[in-house]
Amino acid sequence: MAQRSKAYKAAKAAIGEDLYSPVEAIRLAKETNPSKTDATVEVALRLSVDPRKADQMVRGSVSLPHGTGKTARVVVFATGDRAEAARAAGADVVGDDDLIARISEGWVDFDAAVASPELMGKVGRLGKVLGPRNLMPNPKTGTVTPDVAKAVTDIKGGKIDFRVDKHSNLHFIIGKTSFEAKALVENYAAALEEILRLKPSSSKGRYISKATVATTFGPGVPMDPNVTSVDSSEL
């Protein structure tokens, strides 16, 4: 097990074992960030769903009101006018068979992929590469669309995708430690609202059983999973 830094241990001690409201937890995660870098702030939720069942898969996307703090690298599978529109919207790489071949050889240096619908038959072959990395274009997240330019603009503007993993955990970022705490809280509130909206009707009991927020190199701050209404005015 890796040795923890003194800064990490100090942050862990400051957090203690308490269960915090989301607003308090996010503020504390930001304030106790042990790194001098502008770290990413990430939330982890444990959901009471069984992702092996098709009707309990939680997957979606949301545009964070204050963005993510990073410029996402976006690739687009498109041809003709749609390819030109994607380039004009700021896509980092646009292609068809050439892009598919490049990715099939292991290149995955991007954060999101968008596809024009008519190309999904070919893009689907990349499932073994893109699927495990949650990069496969999907209509449910708006990344399989004829309007590839809008998809690129949305992603560059702070749209994030999320998907529950096989252990029923769901991870998503809410910004950087350089953000004001209010902005981080409002980003979390937007994501939480969408995740709650997507609760499967077949999911019984408490939907969110565990919640934690942490910076890249910081300890997790436990949040009360029963608090589903978040108000930044509490800051």
From Swiss-Prot:
- Keyword Ribosomal protein: yes or no? yes
Looking up PROSITE patterns in the UniProt record yields: RIBOSOMAL_L1 (PS01199)
One Gene Ontology cellular component term attached to this UniProt record is: large ribosomal subunit
Record carries keyword Repressor: yes
Q: Name one GO molecular function term.
A: rRNA binding
What biological-process terms (Gene Ontology) are attached? regulation of translation; translation
**Pfam families linked to this entry:** Ribosomal_L1
| Entry keyword set | Repressor, Ribonucleoprotein, Ribosomal protein, RNA-binding, rRNA-binding, Translation regulation, tRNA-binding
Recorded hits in InterPro entries, A to Z, give: Ribosom_uL1_bac-type (IPR005878), Ribosomal_uL1 (IPR002143), Ribosomal_uL1-like (IPR023674), Ribosomal_uL1/biogenesis (IPR028364), Ribosomal_uL1_3-a/b-sand (IPR016095), Ribosomal_uL1_CS (IPR023673)
Record family assignment: Belongs to the universal ribosomal protein uL1 family.
Q: What does this protein do?
A: Binds directly to 23S rRNA. The L1 stalk is quite mobile in the ribosome, and is involved in E site tRNA release.
User: Subunit notes for this chain?
Assistant: Part of the 50S ribosomal subunit.
Write down what this protein is called: Large ribosomal subunit protein uL1
Organism from which the protein derives:
Micrococcus luteus (strain ATCC 4698 / DSM 20030 / JCM 1464 / CCM 169 / CCUG 5858 / IAM 1056 / NBRC 3333 / NCIMB 9278 / NCTC 2665 / VKM Ac-2230) (Micrococcus lysodeikticus)
